[in-house]
Amino acid sequence: MNAFDSQAEDSPTSLGRSLRRRPLARKKLSEMVEEELEQMIRRHEFGEGEQLPSERELMAFFNVGRPSVREALAALKRKGLVQINNGERARVSRPSADTIISELSGMAKDFLTHPGGIAHFEQLRLFFESSLVRYAAEHATDEQIALLAKALEINSQSLDDNALFIRSDVEFHRVLAEIPGNPIFMAIHVALLDWLIAARPSVPDRELHEHNNVSYQQHIVIVDAIRQRDPDKADRALQTHLNSVSATWHALGKKSQKMR
């Protein structure tokens, strides 16, 4: 008998006479191995940092082939439950915020291609960063405000180089997201910007110069409001900024489509 021997099924009548019989989808062996190992990890049968049994031992325990074991371990790695290094047995790990968000990445990128998808994510970013600037205005330390000012300075030095400006723009907002000290906020923020930037249309560099300067000036207003410890002013400045960014990229996208 192995780990997957089935138990006797209930009588069909127990499900109700009105229900039609329909076949249940069969799970792959690798999925069954994955589920069992995941439960063992969550029950702390294997502690964080501890190595799992070898592939050969897992094959014997579950009575499955090597491909099923390897597929199961790969799935657990994607969930952040194990780390796999070449030549070593899988080692139990704890999922990070980045791991959790990365699991959503494929679905998010697909959703962005749907009608209204970008607008929905822009609204999500607006709601999210609105809370961040309010928090920053009320709680940011002098050191954190100094980091924002430094990011702003780098922003100003990148106005004539679009690639550098985008990086400095992302860095400015990253510093803002870092202020609460919550790693989940950071993971969400990084993912949101990655998804939205990837969905932006390709436009000539000359089209972006004016946009870069406008964004920089709006960043100044945001930082000034945070320095003044005025959450309402910071929130208004942030909303003005993100609405302006959204309108600019929508206009550039339409212009790009007409030129094709």
From Swiss-Prot:
Domain (HTH gntR-type): residue spans on this chain: 27-95
DNA-binding positions: 55-74
Region Disordered: start-end pairs: 1-22
Segments traversing the membrane: none
Gene Ontology BP terms: negative regulation of DNA-templated transcription
Superkingdom as given in the UniProt entry: Bacteria
SUPFAM superfamilies found in the cross-reference section: GntR ligand-binding domain-like (SSF48008), Winged helix' DNA-binding domain (SSF46785)
GO MF entry, a single one: DNA binding
Record SMART domains: FCD, HTH_GNTR
Keywords assigned by UniProt, alphabetized: DNA-binding, Repressor, Transcription, Transcription regulation
Function noted in UniProt: Transcriptional repressor that controls expression of the genes required for the catabolism of sialic acids.
HAMAP family cross-referenced by the UniProt entry: HTH_NanR
Family membership noted in the UniProt record: Belongs to the NanR family.
Name by which UniProt lists this protein: HTH-type transcriptional repressor NanR
Organism expressing this protein natively: Salmonella newport (strain SL254)
